[in-house]
Structures are given as structure tokens and as C-alpha cells.
């Protein structure tokens, strides 16, 4: 499965509250999902939801459009995210209870592709000293909760800042485990903004990224990409990401981001009326995705799968387990205290109380948008 998607959080961090989140308003969902289809994507990433709201219609709309969701379990609201500098103050029952409510509710939608246990939590010296073992603890707790309470297995991963100091050592630490396999991520996302303007596979450094993760035992993809130093963005990296240069290592990616927010990465602008204006970036990305249909992706994927199988067989011959055991230490991050004991055992055993997600029949009205969509020049 190759992810071809966008990051989606209308309103940014203020787009979530007690009353709303990106999947709580069916009218907004219908408007944007029609545009997702025009863009030609198969996956969206959402950074935060409120599990006390109803998401059935929006998730049913996404499913009917053939679109998957990768969902972050944290939110900017109080007690609903890890404090990267003092994680021991936020790793508690209240925090884990909210995480499990998100997981429980969304595990009942079959188009939930995976959960991110964190996003760029390790991004400087202090967070690299204090947070890694707590991120691993949250990964473990979510995976244990899914094992005991979810109707199906769902992968759990992490989304990393593309910081050379921490990217590789932290990915290796999250990949490994000693005794409990739940401490190992199921996938790894990289937020990468290094391809700016006119670049190539080599001048952008994508060749180094592909080389860095060539032996990684978990699926890797871009959880964010799309440098905006040159506007409008041309998205020429799309061809490289889905080419034979990359598909052996990277499973696609998610463009940052759908709606225009203050940081100027938007593909569309939402007008005060709720109508939408497409931005030049939308048209450029659409063209790049359309051009992929001309590439013989299926034969490339088939040959890359054959190569991966051969590599896997070779590795199995040379070592007992392809799953790395944890090292005593990793450069630039502190893992010396070991993974904290879980505070979630009772919650995992009892389960949390939350409305379970379910697909609902959709009416003709729900499948159409009442909003207008304007071209970039009109």
C-alpha cells in the first residue's frame, strides 16, 4: 500500500475544542472530501480529534470515497498530550484515558489505517534527554490496549522531525525491543521539507534518506512533506517519491497541508462563508499526482516486492531475528532509565467508556456539498 495523501487540520491547533474537530461537521467533510477525490489521494492525516464528539458521518463519507485515515492520538487541549520537556508530569491516567478513547472509537472504522503515538516530541536537546522512553511507553500502552480491546489489529507509529541529530537514533530506538514486542513501533513517519524548488533525488538529499532507512524493518513514509520556500510549490518531489529510487524504502507520503493556515502551506483557502478557493499549489499537486498514472507503478511495486522478499530471506539466513534488540545507548538521545512501567494496566483490562465508531447510511444531501469552490483566478 502506497500512501498518497495530505495532512488535514482545518483551523490548525485551534480547530479542536469541546464542540468541534476536523471530523465532527458533515457539511465541511462533504466539501473537503469531494476535493480530496479531485486531488486523487487515498489517505489523510489528522493531528487531533475530540473522542466525545460523533464522527460517524465523516468517517462514512471518507470510507465511501475510498480514503484512509492516519490519526494522531494527542491533542493541544490540556492533559491530552505529552509534555516533551517534563513527560513524567503528563504521562498519567487522565492522559492515557483520552488516548485510549480515541483509539477505541476509531478502531471500529475499517478505514483507520494507523495511529501516531506522537509528533515531533523529540526535537531539541532537552526533549531528547527526557522524552524518548515516554514515547516508547505510549507506543507500548496503545498497542496493548488495541490487543485487548480493539476489534482488529491497527498499526501504531511515530512521526519524527527531520532533524539529523535525532532522526536516525530515535527511529532505531523506537524500532527495537527486548522482551515486549509492543514497545516497537509498527511504522515510522518522517516530516521532511528538504526538497525546495528545483531539485533532484540527489541534490535534495532524498538519496541519503532512502539509504538511511534501507535496512529499517518497519514501513517508513513521509508524514509531512512540501517545502514552501519557493511558491507556488511545484511538488516535483512527488515523481521521485513514487519512483524506483524510493519505493523500495518509502511507502509514499502526506503533503502538508490541505487548508491555508498562518504558516502558508495550504492547498486551498477556506473563505469566511465556508466556500473554498483552490490555491495554485492544489493545481500543481493535482498535476503531479495525475502524472503518476503514466508511470508503471504496479510493475515497479511487484519487482520491489520480489527484491524485498529476497533481501528478507537473506537476512533470515544470516540472523535469527530481523527485529533489532535494543542497544545499551543511542547517540544524542537518553534511554538510560529504561521504559517506564505502564500506568495503564487497569484501563487496558477494563477498557474505557466511549461511543464506538460505526458506519452510517449516507443520504443524497450528505454526499453533496452546499459550498462553492473557486478556481485560483476566480
Regions found by a protein language model. Give the residues of each.
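Noncatalytic carbohydrate-binding groove/subsite architecture in carbohydrate-active enzymes
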Residues: 127-243
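Active-site-adjacent substrate/metal-binding segments within catalytic domains
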Residues: 1-65, 100
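Acidic (Asp/Glu)-rich catalytic clusters
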Residues: 33-37, 56-70, 102-111, 176-183, ...
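Short, acidic/polar
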Residues: 15-36, 95-103, 166-181, 234-241
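Substrate-binding cleft of secreted/luminal carbohydrate-active enzymes
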Residues: 231-353, 358
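Hydrophobic faces of well-ordered beta-strands that scaffold small-molecule active sites
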Residues: 3-6, 42-46, 69-73, 113-117, ...
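Active-site groove signature of glycoside hydrolases
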Residues: 99-130, 157
Amino acid at each position: 500500500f502506497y500512501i498518497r495523501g495530505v495532512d488535514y487540520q482545518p483551523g490548525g491547533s485551534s480547530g479542536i475544542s469541546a464542540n468541534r474537530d476536523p471530523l465532527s461537521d458533515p457539511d465541511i467533510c462533504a466539501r473537503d472530501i469531494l476535493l480530496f477525490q479531485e486531488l486523487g489521494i487515498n489517505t489523510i492525516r489528522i493531528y487531533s480529534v475530540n473522542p466525545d464528539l460523533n464522527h460517524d458521518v465523516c468517517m462514512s463519507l471518507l470510507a465511501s470515497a475510498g480514503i484512509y485515515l492516519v490519526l494522531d492520538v494527542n491533542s493541544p487541549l490540556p492533559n491530552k498530550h505529552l509534555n516533551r520537556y517534563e513527560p513524567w508530569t503528563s504521562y498519567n491516567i487522565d492522559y492515557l484515558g483520552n488516548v485510549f478513547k480515541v483509539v477505541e472509537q476509531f478502531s471500529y472504522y475499517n478505514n483507520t489505517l494507523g495511529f501516531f503515538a506522537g509528533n515531533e516530541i523529540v526535537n531539541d536537546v532537552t526533549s531528547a534527554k527526557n522524552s524518548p522512553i515516554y514515547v516508547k511507553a505510549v507506543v507500548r500502552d496503545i498497542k496493548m490496549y488495541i490487543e485487548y480491546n480493539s476489534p482488529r489489529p491497527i498499526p501504531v507509529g511515530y512521526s519524527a522531525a527531520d532533524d539529523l541529530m535525532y532522526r536516525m537514533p530515535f527511529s532505531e530506538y523506537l524500532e527495537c525491543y527486548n522482551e515486549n514486542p509492543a514497545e516497537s513501533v509498527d511504522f515510522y513517519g518522517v516530516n521532511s521539507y528538504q526538497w525546495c524548488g528545483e531539485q533532484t533525488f540527489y541534490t535534495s538529499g532524498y538519496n541519503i534518506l532512502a539509504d538511511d532507512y534501507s535496512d529499517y524493518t518497519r514501513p517508513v513514509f513521509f508524514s509531512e512533506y512540501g517545502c514552501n520556500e519557493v511558491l507556488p510549490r511545484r511538488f516535483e518531489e512527488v515523481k521521485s517519491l513514487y519512483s524506483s529510487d524510493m519505493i523500495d524504502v518509502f511507502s509514499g507520503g502526506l503533503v502538508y497541508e490541505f487548508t491555508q493556515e498562518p504558516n502558508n502551506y495550504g492547498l486551498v483557502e477556506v473563505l469566511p462563508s465556508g466556500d473554498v478557493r483552490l490555491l495554485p499549489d492544489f493545481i500543481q499537486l493535482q498535476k503531479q499526482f495525475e502524472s503518476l498514472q503514466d508511470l508503471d507503478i504496479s510493475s515497479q511495486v511487484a519487482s520491489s516486492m520480489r527484491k524485498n522478499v529476497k533481501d528478507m530471506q537473506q537476512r533470515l539466513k544470516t540472523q535469527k531475528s530481523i527485529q533489532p534488540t535494543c542497544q545499551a545507548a543511542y547517540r544524542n538521545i537518553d534511554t538510560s532509565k529504561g521504559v517506564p512501567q505502564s500506568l495503564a494496566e487497569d484501563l487496558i483490562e477494563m477498557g474505557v467508556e466511549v461511543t464506538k465508531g460505526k458506519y452510517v447510511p449516507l443520504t443524497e444531501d450528505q454526499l453533496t456539498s452546499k459550498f462553492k469552490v473557486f478556481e485560483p483566478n476566480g
